[in-house]
Curated annotation (Swiss-Prot):
It is found in: Cytoplasm. Pfam families: Coprogen_oxidas (PF01218). This is Oxygen-dependent coproporphyrinogen-III oxidase. NCBIfam families: PRK05330.1. The gene is hemF. It comes from Salmonella typhi.
Length: 299
């Protein structure tokens, strides 16, 4: 089957709806929607839930942008894209809970296609999901990775280990020499063996996010927390901000190419703190996190 951008777009719109409805049902609060247009072509729907019963902030963004030519910054490393019209679309989301015992979660699925008359289209899928705990619970990590492995299994035995490693490698803060969290799945430039296969995998990842995350939310939402746990959560959120602004390719590309800033920065936590050379107390649950987020085989 030829690449079908319209079909992908319809799935992404439904996925945004489904995830928002599911998160609202769990939380009790509703998303507000901000529809926007891109002057150069395209637009999107940014949805945010703030100060809910469980989630301090959850952002679920759909975007679809298109144009007659790629920016020079994009074609410098991909000369085959020069002179082609393009479409880029995706759903991206980040959930920051109130309760420090519930991890922050992130997911993204996307599709890109560039075309010109008389030539085959250039296209690929990308995406994944990853988990950032503040307090480590092994059963949560095992569930998260088992869900990831199970959705990958129909697509080949090597898919989960390959995309788990890619996720571990990608979500790494080089300036801190530490992982952002416990990873999950990350893939990009996926265009083999064919469109149908790749699209099916992207759908499995998108649909798998809530299956991976919500059981963890349910398991941790009633845990009692106080000022100590909250301060540690805000401190660790600083690492999230550092990664997104220093290392994340999507954030940097969006800001450098005139993307919609409010939507790009929707992933930022609403509150965060830094403290010079802060060190957790030896033997404390906070100190245990650095060991917990080390790369390992969880299943």
């Amino acid at each position: 089957m030829k690449p079908d951008a319209h079909h992908v777009k319809q799935f992404l719109l439904r996925l945004q709806d489904d995830i928002c409805q599911t998160l609202s049902a769990v939380d009790g609060a509703n998303f507000i929607e901000d529809s926007w247009r891109r002057e150069a072509g395209g637009g999107g729907r940014s949805r945010v839930l703030r100060n809910g019963g469980i989630f301090e902030q959850a952002g679920v963004n759909f975007s679809h942008v298109h144009g007659d030519a790629m920016p020079a910054s994009a074609t410098a490393h991909r000369p085959e894209l020069a002179g082609r019209s393009f479409e880029a679309m995706g759903v991206s989301l980040v959930v920051h809970p109130h309760n420090p015992y519930i991890p922050t979660s992130h997911a993204n699925v996307r599709f890109f296609i560039a075309e010109k008359p008389g030539a085959d289209p250039v296209w690929w899928f990308g995406g994944g999901f990853d988990l950032t705990p503040y307090y480590g619970f092994e059963e949560d990590a095992v569930h998260w990775h088992r869900t990831a492995r199970d959705l990958c299994q129909p697509f080949g035995d090597d898919v989960y280990p390959r995309y788990k490693k890619w996720c571990d490698d990608y979500f790494f803060l080089k300036h801190r020499n530490e992982q952002r969290g416990i990873g999950g799945l990350f893939f990009d430039d996926l265009n083999t063996p064919d469109f149908d296969h790749c699209f099916a995998f992207m759908q499995a990842v998108g649909n798998g996010y809530t299956e991976a995350y919500l059981p963890i939310v349910e398991r941790r939402k009633a845990m009692v927390w106080g000022e100590r746990e909250r301060n540690f959560q805000l401190y660790r959120r600083g690492r999230y901000v550092e990664f997104n602004l220093v290392w994340d390719r999507g954030t940097l590309f969006g800001l450098q190419t005139g993307g919609r800033t409010e939507s790009i920065l929707m992933s930022m936590p609403p509150l965060v703190r830094w403290e010079y050379d802060w060190q957790p107390e030896a033997g404390s649950p906070e100190a245990a996190l650095s060991e917990f987020i080390q790369v390992r085989d969880w299943i």
